[in-house]
Structures are given as structure tokens and as C-alpha cells.
Amino acid sequence: MKYVDIDRIYQTVPLDKIPWNSEAPPDKLVELVQSGKVRPCKTIDLGCGAGNYAIYLAERGFEVIGVDSSPTVIKIATENAQKRGVRCKFIVADLLGDLHEVKETFDFGYDWDFLHHIFPEDRVKYLKNVYNILKPGAQYLSVCFSEKDPQFDGMGKYRKTPIGTILYFSSESEIHDLFSPYFDIQELKTIEIKTKSVSHYAIYVLSERR
């Protein structure tokens, strides 16, 4: 199955019409920060989009690098950080490539609304990349759509969205089997998350890099 050109979407669709773009950070990410489960540290935002979540963390003392495959949205993210007066570094990189652009290792990494864009045959490669850029003992948060979610016709593992992307909807057991060779799973559960217009069932996994 072929991936959609995400950069083309960012070039042609206004940000306020892109369903995964949200200025407000997700409640679950805010909870991790406010509870102290994740403290200011070197952090990487995987599939950072317009950089809104990275900026939120940077404003709270985190040293954040955001990575995305779209040059268009990385430029937007850089401009957004400048407007907010925070220091964030944003890098164009293929998260399914060798990630040679990322020269550092991190204490905390996360992807939100990103893993479901990656098809199963590429997920081990992605997880190995995440593993390699995180320090031993680093925390990793990932949230992706659940197969229990009724949106986009509510049928099948692969579903096409109105914006044209094709997403893969996972089960908890799939996520467990994907993560467990590389990470010690601390929490794995199905939660409800809100996007601009609807709510989704999503799989939340918080883990620690071995």
C-alpha cells in the first residue's frame, strides 16, 4: 500500500482544515507533565507537524526537537516557535529512514496521532529508530487510533480519511507485541481522544526504553 504525500497536504490544505493539527496540547500529555511523571528533559516529538505540542513543552522547560517528513510543516513549526518566543529545533527527516539528521539521544520521546499513519510492515523499522534515539531508561509515549474506533466507516484495519490519508487501526495486542521487544510497557489502554470535530478511540501506551 502506498503512502500519501503528506507534504502535498500541508502545501494545499489550510492548517485549520487538517484534522490532526491542534494548537492545544492533548489532555493526556498535559497530565503527564502536570503530574510530574515526565519532567523537563531532552525530548523528541516524532511527527511534530506544526510544532504546537513541542512549543507547549518548551514553554515549560523542556529541550525539544521536533521531527517531521514535511519540509512545508517544519517551516511552519519553526515560525510558530519564533512567534511564541521559545527555543525549539525542528528537523526534516524520514522517520522510516536512517534518521541520520538526528544527532542526539533523548530522555523522553512521543508521537501523538502519528503511528496510525505507519503501515504494519514498516512499524518495526520505526520502533527500532525510536529505540536508537532514546537513552536507556527514557520514557516513550505513543497514541494511535484503535480498531474499536467507529470513525471513517468503522470497518477494516485500513481506512481512508476525508483528507485522503490511509490509516491503520490497531488492536491493543498488536501494540503490545510491537513495543515489548524494545520497551518495558508501563501503561497500555484504550482511551477516548478528541480532535477538531469528533472523538476517537485510541490506544495509549507509555513505556520505558530498555
Mark where each language-model region is.
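A conserved beta-strand element that flanks and buttresses the S-adenosyl-L-methionine
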Residues: 110
